[in-house]
Amino acid sequence: MATIKEDYVSFETAKLLKEKGFDESISMVYMSYGDLCKLHRYDSIRNSNYNDITKNYFECTAPTLQMAMKWLRIEHNIHIEPHIVRTKCSYGYMPNYIDLKELKQHFPFDEFDFSNADKYVCITYDKACEATIKYCLEHLI
């Protein structure tokens, strides 16, 4: 039986979250070279605790996909909801978000063409969540 593990945002997305104000208490961090590292058993840290002393140890906190999605929902009224879609070859997940202020659904790519869906479809739900989080941070916040 496979072990279920937490899915963390990528190093690039974690840096974007820090830049955009994500400051929750987290026990996982990214080192300056991009490796994921767990803090001591009961320790946690916030991005705002980053200073001259800690910069030698870590670059930014490493939230799970769910924490990042919840932060976007609570702080920015953006609900991430990838859709399962059928493509020419198989099934996959389409990045998608809902603007809760307008109650309007959006696909993150303006030029999206359903006839060429394979170009935008992610193989896994987690990759679709990551792609949508990154898009929202880069274009909406």
Regions found by a protein language model. Give the residues of each.
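Glycine-rich anion-binding surface patch
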Residues: 1-141
